[in-house]
């Protein structure tokens, strides 16, 4: 796959020391905010249903956030993303028209448990990297269509990127992971859920699940079309 090398080098090579102090502090604040909103969301019917589903149909040994029952890494991402999204009180980025963190945190939480080599510093770095990837992907996707679509569409691509880094995939595999995630991500019409409020919310949990699954598929040799974000116009 032909991809701007600088983007992939950035995903694989950025370090904690590269981040300005104010960015490091903001990443910690975002983490605390996501945990707090998720703790509140865990009491909702939406969260209970999705956690029950993940435990049943996406079973594994990794404890889900705010639950403790086991699920796969993708299941942890799905359940946690929808739980944080349940109250719609988490951080946002206006140009992106949505929320990055609610899908990133549970995806990282599941992967960190599964891989068992992720330090706290690397976790925070990948959370920060995920915000950068997610917001750039949002701008790329929104520019490509007139319809306002869900955060899960672009969170999926960001999760795939940080998952690829944590899984130590090479540049080609990373590009495929992000391409798979964009193709499979929930690029749903957001206004339908605003006009008719339901438990679908912003698609963030489904996007997180897609991102984790995409990285797993790419690691196995599955191929995907190039993600819009990887175009030079967005870097």
Residue ranges: model-predicted function:
Residues 1-235:
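N-terminal core-entry segment
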């Amino acid at each position: 796959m032909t991809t701007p090398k600088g983007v992939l080098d950035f995903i694989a090579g950025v370090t904690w020391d590269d981040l300005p102090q104010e960015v490091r502090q903001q990443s910690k604040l975002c983490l605390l905010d996501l945990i707090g909103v998720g703790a509140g969301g865990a009491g909702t019917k939406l969260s209970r249903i999705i956690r029950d589903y993940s435990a049943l149909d996406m079973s594994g040994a990794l404890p889900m956030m705010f639950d403790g029952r086991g699920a796969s890494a993708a299941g942890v991402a799905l359940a946690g993303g929808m739980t944080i999204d349940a109250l719609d009180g988490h951080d946002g980025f206006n140009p992106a028209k949505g929320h990055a963190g609610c899908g990133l945190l549970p995806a990282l939480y599941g992967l960190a448990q599964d891989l068992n080599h992720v330090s706290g510093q690397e976790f925070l770095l990948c959370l920060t990297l995920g915000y950068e990837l997610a917001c750039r992907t949002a701008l790329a996707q929104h520019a490509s269509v007139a319809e306002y679509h869900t955060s899960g569409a672009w969170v999926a691509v960001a999760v795939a990127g940080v998952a690829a880094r944590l899984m130590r995939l090479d540049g080609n595999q990373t590009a495929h992971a992000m391409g798979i995630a964009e193709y499979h991500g929930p690029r749903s019409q957001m206004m339908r859920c605003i006009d008719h409020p339901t438990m679908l919310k912003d698609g963030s949990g489904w996007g997180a699940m897609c991102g984790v699954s995409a990285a797993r598929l790419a690691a196995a040799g599955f191929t995907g079309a190039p993600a819009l974000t990887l175009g030079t116009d967005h870097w």
